[in-house]
Amino acid sequence: MNPNSKHNTNFTNLLKPSDSDIKQFAAQHIRHLTDLLNRYAYEYYTLDAPSVPDAEYDKLFRELEALERNHPELKLPDSPTQRVGGEPLAGFAEVRHEVPMLSLTNAFSPQDENGVFDHAEMYAFDQRVRDGLDGGKPEYVIEPKFDGLAISLLYRDGVLVQAATRGDGTTGEDVTQNVKTVANIPLRLHGENTPELIEVRGEVLMLKADFAALNKRQAENGQKPFANPRNAAAGSLRQLDSRITAQRKLHFFPYSVARQQGGFVAEEHIQELAYFQALGFSLPNGNFGCFKNIDEVLTFYEQMQQKRPELPYEIDGMVVKVNSLAQQRELGFISRAPRWAVAHKFPAEEALTIVEAIDVQIGRTGAVTPVARLQPVFVGGVTVTNATLHNQDEVSRKDVRVGDTVVVRRAGDVIPEVVRVIFERRPMRETAVAVSDGIGHRQDDLFAETPSANQTQSVPLHKPYRLPTHCPICRSEIEREEGEAVARCSGGMLCQAQRAQGLIHFASRKAMDIDGLGEKQIEQLVAQDLVLHFADLYRLDIPTLQKMKETADKTVAESDQMPSEGSSVGASGKHKKQPVKWAENILAGIESGKTPELARFLFALGIRHVGERTAKTLAQAFGTLERVRRAPEPVLACLPDIGTVVARSIAHFFAQAEQQAMIDELLAAGVAPQTQAVTIPPARHAEPQRWIARLPDFKISENKAQALWELAGKNIEGLQNDKALPADWQAWRSEPQNAALLENLKTFFAQMPSEDEAAQGSDGINKAVAGKTFVLTGTLPTLKRDQAQSLIEAAGGKVSGSVSKKTDYVVAGEAAGSKLEKANALGVSILSEAELLTLLG
């Protein structure tokens, strides 16, 4: 080849790409990553069938973030990085709805005390529809009426360009930046047949589980909790700082098309819903349907009313729509509502009644809860006679008093609560009032003005309620810690109420699961001082149980005239105690429950802030009771879903000598919690920069904590003794309690398994089960659902509520439903109960 040829001259330049080439490549790769990540999000949120692991998604996401940082001008409007939120706004712009966002007419089906519905209003709706169609026979679609915030999403050329709240129906607020953080709202529509323009109407809401997690974080951060998921969703969507919205998991379900140009032209509403899913939206699968007549609609409505408490989201009824879009147009609108749709509300969950008295209940942790005793009222399908007032702050805020007419709410299995007072109905009394003449009089001045009969004013009949100063059960002082909303009885296990509630919790199905020992028997044992501590349960015998039974049943007349249950009369006429089956069953239940799973045992102890989930986290992180007992607070605070407040509560519990003595007594009585597989890797909570950053009274970032660790030679001895460390650290470690904490940390980590040991299963992990995802469906022959879940989790597996491509096994019992069908369709392995037990070993 001629070295002077012009091809050879340009070869070097070809090896070095120009700035425009780099930019073109970056633009192409950004487009590729954006499309790829949006497709993965669609598979995850809409199809519930992810095709890549989370780690792969995260890796690609970080790659896209880096490219966009280097080339901000190339960032696309549908980039998934927008879901983390942007800079705060000064305010929300107004958006005028081209198609008004109208409301629906309500229909109600009252339910009598026998649970029978009166569907007269729905039959009337059906008749109006038929009349409007000149006797035509409509089909109906019924779907959930979500208790959230209505919004409108506008897409142009498949890209989300605007999101607006309903507002007054004509004008709403532009919340586009916030809506882009909602994970299951597509930023770019999917599929090939996307319209040039489409405006999708739907509801933004917060799932019940996400609401509970948010309120837990609010409480841990000393912030006011939200009253309900709807308020939480509305407040989150209207944040000026979209980064806050991004932290609060919101969800969206579409329910109608306001306008559309191009794309698939639906003839029925049920087709619209299917089109939504094809475009990338999520649907409330299994909770909507199309039916041929109103009777089928009402049957589904009643089924959904029963199913309501189990749903992952709040609904307050069902929306019924004429399916045919042509028939919808024919029926048209009346005022500001369509004739072809109705909001079929569930039976009232709120009702008016009168507060007859206010007293208090003492919980197992000593919490003093004011309770309103009510005139019986039928609400939410049951007769309600009591309602919680939560705490003194809530009583004062709502100003609930004896005699007040109040609104009571009961939703699903939630404890009834007093929502508000109807102040105009408050009972009043007339009282004399002295009117001053403006002249100062001595106390004995004969001319000083005195109240006259006609100088009166109305004042409330009853004074504002205040909690008692002493426990009504044990007379111990009621105390309220600074910053706490709840007041507590200081009596501990000396208080019969706390003792009874603590023992009931200890023996409950989700805790120690002591078969045969119910609330009634525990209350009787406590009332007679036969059981003072948890360990006393394991010292019970038949004579003690018989004594409990006889004392509880005995009346003055019976004690002289007739033998009690479990006794016989001998020739001498004296009562002779005989063993009875019920007592033997209780003792057998106590004995069989002596080897609980570690998570159940921890939950049973009644540690404040430790529910089932937190107990499982502790068991999975530490593996043995001894490690949990000795876990230092900073290490606890590093665990998933355990913040500083919960960590402090756990550490405080195990730091108390009486609690350690109580556990020792249980162990001495033969209780032996099982060893749990360590399935949360130690690195999750043992990385030095993490626990150092969580040391009490020493504020430091994780980056600075890492630097401190390296300065100390990467060992705790260095933290304890190195004199070259920063002065603020040396001052902190010089405090006796902090020096003791460092020594505790050193001892604790010496006993914890290493990362490799945990991975190799040195703590009894079942390698065939560890890290696998199981779904349970149907009724198993011998195991209850929670028993099967506990066995799987104890072996290191996970249990999910839905089937996806991530599912490893579906355990199917009798009457397995749609989960089994989906598992077969996805090729997921199906196990019987026997096969599960074999796998578990």
Curated annotation (Swiss-Prot):
Segments for region (Disordered): 554-575
Q: Which SUPFAM superfamilies match?
A: BRCT domain, DNA ligase/mRNA capping enzyme, catalytic domain, Nucleic acid-binding proteins, RuvA domain 2-like
Task: Quote the cellular component terms of the Gene Ontology held in the record.
Answer: cytosol
PANTHER family, sorted? CHROMOSOME TRANSMISSION FIDELITY FACTOR 18 (PTHR23389), DNA LIGASE (PTHR23389:SF9)
> Residue ranges under compositional bias (Polar residues)?
561-570
UniProt entry keywords in alphabetical sequence: DNA damage, DNA repair, DNA replication, Ligase, Magnesium, Manganese, Metal-binding, NAD, Zinc
Catalysed reaction equations from the record: NAD(+) + (deoxyribonucleotide)n-3'-hydroxyl + 5'-phospho-(deoxyribonucleotide)m = (deoxyribonucleotide)n+m + AMP + beta-nicotinamide D-nucleotide
Q: What is its EC number?
A: 6.5.1.2
Molecular-function GO term, any one? metal ion binding
> Which family does the entry's similarity section mention?
Belongs to the NAD-dependent DNA ligase family. LigA subfamily.
Q: What is this protein called?
A: DNA ligase
Per UniProt, what is the name of the gene that codes for the protein in this document? ligA
